[in-house]
Design a protein with these regions (language model features):
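C-terminal cap of metal-dependent C-N hydrolases
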Residues: 99-105, 110-111, 123, 130, ...
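Generic recognition of well-ordered alpha-helical segments
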Residues: 134-137, 157, 201, 208
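Acidic, glycine-enriched loop/beta-strand segments at the rims
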Residues: 87-97, 142-151, 159-196
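A short, hydrophobic/aromatic-rich structural module that often spans a beta strand
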Residues: 161, 227-229
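Flexible loop/turn segments at secondary-structure boundaries
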Residues: 82-86, 114-118, 158-161, 187-189, ...
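Active-site neighborhoods of metal-dependent hydrolases
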Residues: 1-143
Length: 229
């Protein structure tokens, strides 16, 4: 059966009940409902297909249920039937993040895809705020990392691991990939309501020695190049 036939079966309360039972009792690692603590409050709707009520955007599945006048499980099935939504599952808590940061071998990265605000309709806020958040929250606010260690985990440590020996350090002979920021002002401001907002407190960014952010303004230059080991 195809997608349309499957979606049609979701109108059957018996099918919904069976799917719910399987999800609640299956311990497989691909079960994201378990990853979020089996709580629809931990699943945030970030965008929706054309046939979906736009009021559910930026709400959890539980919050969407309140808007739609139903319970969370039926809201989930109703949203799938209406065309689907994109979600952000909150599968890690702060304690788990602190445990990871306590390990000296842990690097800091993000899997967000690079996007151009002038040509892209949407993005994940981590594309614009992941690294500034490390400094504003885990260095300045929580004190979980020193500034030097945070920078190391986001630059030289990753460069060494990837075998990029001429990058990641500020030293004679190194490629000038540099970022100048105010450690007291840098912070992420992007969120799911407005994901493509540049972080604050970053004044200059140099790629291969060329300023791509110049006094806080994006420059119309393309000095980057493909790196091959």
């Amino acid at each position: 059966e195809g997608t349309s036939e499957f979606l049609a079966t979701l109108a059957d309360p018996a099918v919904r009940a069976e799917l719910r039972r399987e999800v609640e009792t299956t311990g497989d690692w691909e079960n994201w409902y378990r990853h979020v603590g089996m709580d629809w409050e931990n699943v945030l709707i970030v965008s929706a297909a054309g046939g979906v009520d736009e009021r559910v955007i930026n709400r959890s599945i539980s919050g969407a249920a309140e808007v739609l006048g139903t319970d969370a499980w039926d809201a989930f099935f109703d949203l799938v039937q209406a065309g689907g939504v994109s979600v952000n599952p909150r599968s890690m808590n702060e304690e788990q993040k602190w445990q990871a940061l306590a390990a000296e071998y842990v690097m800091i990265d993000t899997d967000a895809s690079p996007v151009n605000p002038a040509t892209s309709a949407s993005a994940h806020p981590r594309a614009f705020g992941a690294f500034p958040r490390v400094i504003s929250k885990y260095v300045r606010q929580d004190g979980a990392l020193s500034l030097e260690d945070a920078v190391r985990r986001m630059s030289s440590m990753a460069a060494q691991r990837l075998g990029l020996h001429d990058r990641g350090f500020v030293a004679p002979g190194q490629i000038a990939d540099l970022l100048l920021f105010d450690p007291d002002a840098i912070r992420d401001v992007a969120d799911f309501g407005d994901a493509m907002r540049y972080a604050e407190g970053i004044d200059y960014v140099f790629v291969n020695g060329v300023a791509v952010i110049d006094d806080g303004v994006l420059a119309d230059v393309r000095p980057g190049r493909l790196l091959r080991r």
